[in-house]
């Protein structure tokens, strides 16, 4: 029998950018870092100009005649391109509604698991539907389910804000959370204590002038 073909598991070779000595065209149309046209010059001359300015010669249009190169900081250019690609990918993300289901009698471990799931969904930019499922006569414990959902909203207040507070939906109790747009600003506990104390201090009694 012929030997079975072996799969090449090596990572694919990444195509190297056409910069500096990897540019093989003898004549190039060159643009400097400020966008100024340097005209059509020899490859060696273009490389020399780039070296003098401590920058890179980058091929930007291979199909042009002659090919067009630009003198630039390639490391900075690559960083900006990757940054733009990440921002474009982030903007193209379609917001989805992810659901986290639980019973109103949930133990701490399972509750922590649901919190972790919700945090991952919110971090990905998705909304979260928190659902408490009732079975049979459990429907009479909607108050406990509401307490559970409000506890979850409190535990997730940093990455999320409540889009829809707890409410009945059929035989379930639901709540919607959405990723928080602005960072949560928490009041300092000492400040809250002081403010509370100030509110409870009675106003001084008005003096009555008994003199004639």
Curated annotation (Swiss-Prot):
Recorded superkingdom: Bacteria
Keywords for this protein: Cytoplasm, Initiation factor, Protein biosynthesis
GO cellular component: cytosol; membrane
Coiled coil: none
UniProt key word Manganese: no
Cellular localisation: Cytoplasm
Keyword Protein biosynthesis: yes
Listed GO MF terms: ribosome binding; translation initiation factor activity
Name this polypeptide is given: Translation initiation factor IF-3
Organism: Synechococcus sp. (strain CC9311)
Lineage: Bacteria, Bacillati, Cyanobacteriota, Cyanophyceae, Synechococcales
């Amino acid at each position: 029998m012929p030997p079975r073909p072996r799969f090449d598991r090596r990572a694919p070779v990444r195509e190297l950018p056409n910069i500096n000595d990897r540019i093989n065209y003898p004549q190039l149309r060159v643009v400097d870092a400020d966008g100024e046209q340097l005209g059509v010059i020899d490859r060696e001359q273009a490389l020399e100009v780039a070296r003098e300015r401590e920058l890179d010669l980058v091929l930007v249009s291979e199909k042009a005649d002659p090919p067009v190169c630009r003198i630039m900081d390639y490391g900075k250019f690559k960083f900006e391109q990757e940054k733009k690609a990440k921002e474009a990918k982030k903007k193209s993300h379609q917001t989805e509604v992810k659901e986290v289901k639980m019973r109103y009698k949930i133990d701490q471990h399972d509750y922590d698991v649901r919190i972790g799931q919700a945090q991952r969904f919110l971090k990905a930019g998705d909304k979260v539907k928190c659902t408490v499922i009732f079975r049979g006569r459990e429907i009479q414990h909607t108050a406990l389910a509401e307490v559970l959902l409000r506890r979850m909203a409190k535990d997730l207040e940093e990455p999320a804000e409540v889009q829809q507070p707890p409410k009945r939906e059929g035989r379930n109790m639901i709540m919607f959370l959405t990723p928080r747009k602005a960072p949560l600003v928490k009041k300092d506990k000492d400040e809250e204590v002081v403010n509370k104390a100030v509110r409870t201090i009675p106003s001084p009694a008005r003096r009555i002038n008994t003199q004639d």
